[in-house]
A protein has these predicted regions:
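TPR/Sel1-like alpha-solenoid repeat signature
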Residues: 432-439, 451, 465-476, 485, ...
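Terminal, low-structured helical/coil segments at or just beyond the last alpha-helical repeat
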Residues: 611-646
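Polytopic membrane enzymes that build or remodel cell-surface glycoconjugates and lipids
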Residues: 1-480, 487, 491-505, 509, ...
Length: 646
């Protein structure tokens, strides 16, 4: 009884300690903002999550693949966050941290339940909790899919062990459903059935393969006394493999639908294989030396000797693992866990432009943590006292906590993140683009252009830096130069939505409305799912006095993004011109509801209310408009058409 009570106390103390080291590193993220690199795509500008939990939004999450991924459960988690926290990034960060805490504690409890080795399980959980390579998965809100899917991965492993204790379909079904939920969070979980096969070998010991494991005494009782042939264990996983096959098909469909899968013409197969081999080796380096971590690693020109050395290194490890797999069964489990779970993201099927990514190591490194933990115990237990081992372990965790704390700081904002990335990588097209975009927001035009020029050197055939330079010219008021640059970008890529959109905006500002409308319509033809394009098209029609066309465009924008304050305001102004005052009032009030400090909506709402004889309410909204923007004291109410889009 006392032993059982002591074990429970140890589990509680370890769980609290794991939580404490995570909070020590990640507490700061509550003050961080969104990153202008996928956070906009998944959260800030993703109108699909802004409408809350409705039947329509849930169906949309289950059917839409606009990001190039099918992960409806992750979309729903962002939806819930937006309901709770809105655009307060701190709340979104906390959700990711809490899920990471759950993952680390569950990982500890799982290995302790599976092996009975409480302190080894604690060390694995601590490494997972605080290793700096996992910072990207936790501190980057857009990577919610990583932490959320891992939660279901660990839960599925728990349910699998529960099933193994007393196999039945009633126990298999919860595991099956949990795995399905994990795949709906991120398809990287497709390798889980193969990891379960590894666990069948060790520590579940369900196979007929003999083991000479010295650590079997640590397992309090056999989880399953029955031994199975490998073929039987594979057949047992067939329903899970069926889900894997479905997920793979959905993933390919989603990626192909938005063109995120790189063709072999862009990145030949031999280069992909070379990069995969070197990346496997580089991940191992980051395990032991987690510095110079970056949000994006560009592909490098790898020499034959680099690929050969990496391949030889991996081959030697694999040979050692195979040689000692009977004596040290954790070696093949950990090593093939690492190799196997990286397969979907190692780059043979290239999605995106990265050579490798820290976030991809979140799950695979668990396999390496198994090897490090059990291997170190076997090496040192007869040579060093338990107290010294405990002290060394504590120092390792402390050092990793400090490094992780420093790594988290790079995620405070976009500028800091990409500045660091440029410092630790070379020829990084994506990082230069991120820096340039941030510099434009800060009105540091010349510095931004410098980064865009570097991008042109790195990839002269890319339209992206030209679009950026065009935006810079536009901000400077050099519209002719901006137009010429956008047209140059369109020569390189006639289907550049950003080039058409930005060109249309400059033409709109210059009063060349027919040309602007043509560019907006071309952009909509390329991407009819962008409400901003419809809103800007409506503005151009409204400027021309084509109110009916403008109303159609604004309604199209609101159909896609109902909570668009700007579109409601602009629609209200056009309706006001048509003397449809009640409809105009409804739209102005909705704009103010969505954006209380919307001076333009307050001002023109006051004008309509005054015309309807509602003087007191009209005066309130007029005063609000002037409070927000004193320029509304002298504005000519009859020139409202000029304020379309404000």
């Amino acid at each position: 009884m006392n032993k059982h009570k002591s074990a429970n106390q140890n589990r509680l103390i370890i769980s609290i300690s794991v939580i404490a080291i995570i909070l020590a590193s990640y507490w700061q993220v509550q003050n961080y903002g969104f990153i202008s690199y996928d956070d906009q795509l998944y959260i800030v500008d993703n109108y699909r999550i802004h409408s809350g939990f409705t039947f329509k939004s849930i169906v949309d999450a289950l059917t839409n693949v606009h990001t190039g991924h099918w992960h409806p459960l992750t979309i729903m988690s962002h939806m819930l966050d937006w309901n709770l926290f809105g655009d307060n990034a701190g709340g979104h960060h906390w959700t990711s941290v809490i899920i990471h805490i759950l993952n680390a504690v569950l990982l500890f409890l799982f290995f302790q339940y599976l092996t009975g080795a409480i302190w080894k399980s604690a060390f694995i959980a601590a490494l997972f909790a605080i290793h700096p390579i996992n910072v990207e998965s936790v501190a980057w809100i857009a990577e919610r899919k990583n932490v959320l899917s891992t939660f279901f991965w660990i839960l599925t492993m728990f349910l699998y062990v529960w099933y193994v204790r007393s196999p039945s379909w009633k126990r298999y079904l919860p595991m099956f459903l949990c795995f399905a939920l994990g795949l709906m969070a991120k398809p990287m979980l497709v390798t889980l059935p193969f990891v379960l096969l590894l666990l069948d070998y060790w520590p579940l010991n369900r196979t007929i393969i003999n083991q000479q494991n010295k650590n079997q005494a640590e397992i309090p009782e056999p989880i399953s006394l029955k031994k199975y042939k490998i073929t039987s264990l594979i057949w047992e996983k067939v329903p899970l493999l069926f889900l894997t096959a479905i997920s793979i098909c959905l993933t390919f469909y989603a990626a192909k639908s938005v063109g995120t899968i790189a063709s072999l013409n862009i990145l030949p197969l031999n280069k992909r294989i070379s990069n995969a081999i070197v990346s496997y080796a580089l991940y191992l380096k980051k395990l032991f030396w987690p510095i110079d971590l970056a949000v994006f690693y560009p592909h490098l020109d790898l020499s034959l000797w680099q690929v050969s050395v990496a391949a030889l290194f991996l081959l030697i490890i694999t040979i050692i693992v195979c040689k000692y797999f009977h004596k040290y069964p954790y070696l093949p489990v950990g090593w093939f866990w690492y190799l196997g779970t990286l397969v979907p993201v190692i780059g043979i099927v290239q999605v995106g432009g990265q050579a490798m990514a820290d976030r991809y190591a979140y799950l695979p490194f668990i396999g390496l943590f198994i090897i490090v933990t059990w291997g170190a115990a076997d090496i040192f237990k007869k040579r060093i006292s338990i107290k010294i081992i405990a002290m060394i372990s504590a120092l390792i965790i402390l050092a990793l906590t400090v490094v992780a704390h420093c790594q988290v700081k790079y995620w405070r904002d976009t500028f800091t993140l990409f500045s660091h990335t440029l410092n630790v990588t070379k020829n990084n097209f994506i990082a230069h683009n991120g820096m340039a975009s941030e510099l434009l927001k800060q009105d540091k035009i010349e510095e931004a252009i410098t980064h865009y020029n570097v991008m042109l050197i790195l990839d002269p055939k890319s339209d992206i830096p030209l679009v950026g330079i065009g935006r810079a010219f536009s901000i400077k008021g050099e519209n002719d130069a901006a137009i010429a640059t956008f047209r140059q970008a369109l020569k390189l890529n006639p289907e550049s939505i950003e080039a058409h959109h930005n060109l249309g905006f400059v033409l709109f500002q210059m009063g060349r409305l027919d040309e602007a409308i043509a560019e907006y319509q071309k952009a909509i033809e390329l991407n009819g799912d962008n409400p901003t394009l419809y809103n800007n098209l409506g503005n151009a029609f409204a400027k021309q006095g084509k109110d009916i066309e403008a109303i159609k465009a604004y309604n199209a924008a609101l159909l896609i993004r109902p909570r668009d304050a700007g579109a409601h305001n602009n629609l209200g102004m056009v309706l006001m011109h048509l003397y449809k005052y009640d409809e105009a009032i409804r739209n102005f009030k909705e704009a103010i509801h969505l954006q209380p400090e919307y001076a333009n909506a307050h001002f023109y709402l006051s004008e309509i209310l005054k015309r309807k004889g509602l003087s007191a309410e009209a005066e309130y909204h007029l005063n609000e408009a002037i409070r927000i923007n004193s320029e509304y004291k002298n504005i000519d109410k009859l020139q409202s058409r000029h304020n379309i889009g404000k």
